[in-house]
Structures are given as C-alpha cells and as structure tokens.
Amino acid sequence: MTNLYPKRTRTKLANKQKMIRVAINLFARKGYQATTQEEIAQDANLHLQTLYRHFRSKEELAIAAAELSVSDCNERFKNNFSHANTFEIWRKWIKSSSSFLLSLGIGEEKRDRLCSASSLMNDNYLLIIYSGYEDLLTHYIAQDFCMDVKIDRLPRLVAGMLWNGNEAAMKRCAGKDTQSNNLHNVNHVLAESLAVVDDIEAVFKGHIKLQRRSHELFSDTHSSSQFGPMGER
C-alpha cells in the first residue's frame, strides 16, 4: 500500500489537471453556459464521477480553470518582463494561446453569446477570470509606467482596455458590428485580436519608463490554456 499511494496521488493530480485544461478549452470554444460537465469528462477521457470527486460544481471547476489560466500567463510575464514590456508580452500571449484554440474551432454557441445583448452576464467563466487578468495586467503596467496604483488610475484603466479588447475583437469577428461572421477564419480573428493590442499600445506606449536589457531572447513557450481573443483563458 505504501508504494501504491504516491502513484495513486499522482494519477489523481494528473486527472485533475487534465479536466481543468479541457474545461479551459471548452469554455473558450463554446462558452461557459453551453459547456456541460459531461462534455468535460468525456473530452478528458474520464468518468463523470471522477470529475465530481474533484469538483462539486461547474462553477468550482471554472474557478480552478481561471486560476490556472491566469497562472500560465503570469509565468509568461515573469519569464520575459526583464526584456519585454507588457504590450509585447501580452501580444505574444494572445497570438500563441489564441492560435491553439482557434485551431480547435469556435462553436455556434460561442458566436451566439458574443452577439447577445448580455454576453458577459451569460458566461460565468469570463466573469470569474476577469479580475485575475485585470489584476495581473495592472501589476505589470504599473511597473512599466513607473506608477503607484495607490495613486495613479492609469495602470488599471489600460489593463481593462487590454482585457476588454479581446472581447471587442471577438464580437467584431462574430459580426456584432460588421454583420459578417468571420470566427471560422483563423487569420482574420488573429489579425483583429492583435490589432486591438497594437491600437492600445500606440496610445499608451509613451508612458513606458522602465529601462530593460535588449539582448535576451523572448521566451514564447506554447500554452494550451486559453484566453487570447476568445476573452477567456
């Protein structure tokens, strides 16, 4: 029994991580409301009861998924912030994470949510993850701008623009403003999502005061946890 316990523990942890990763992808592709716990268990090749042993509700799973997604993004920032600014890191994060999820396809449920009058209210995952990404971006933007968030409101304002820019880009691609559905066009969605980051950077880049070394390579490891232009991760 002594020898089996560590193996069982590792298996439980691996199963839990697998379910969280699958949930991140499904929430991004279909939206929180349209994703069922049965689908998550099935895509993770696990029994539904295994999922319930780890997560008593879908909301509990969404919280874990949001925390992991923000943690992945934070690792990207920690690995690159000494030689790249917030806008550069965020742009590459959007590109790599979104490319992965777009390759899996966006469901019609997701498009319907994006075009609805209450798109955020219908997606608990987005509501849960919002504060995590906004806090993360605020932290690094404040360092870039050499500002104190206790005094200056600009870092959180810019962070909110970067985060909400993902939702804005996806709404445009879903036809909210353009009356043309381009969610199936990976290149179009990526271009729209990155253009949002570029537009915000063009306005606020002049506020960057932090000096950096320029000789280091950018760490751009792939992440399967989503957020990117879907507005989730």
Q: What residues fall within each predicted segment?
A:
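Amphipathic alpha-helical packing segments from all-alpha helical-bundle domains
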Residues: 118-146, 153-160
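Basic, helix-initiating cap at the start of DNA-binding domains
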Residues: 1-30, 34-46
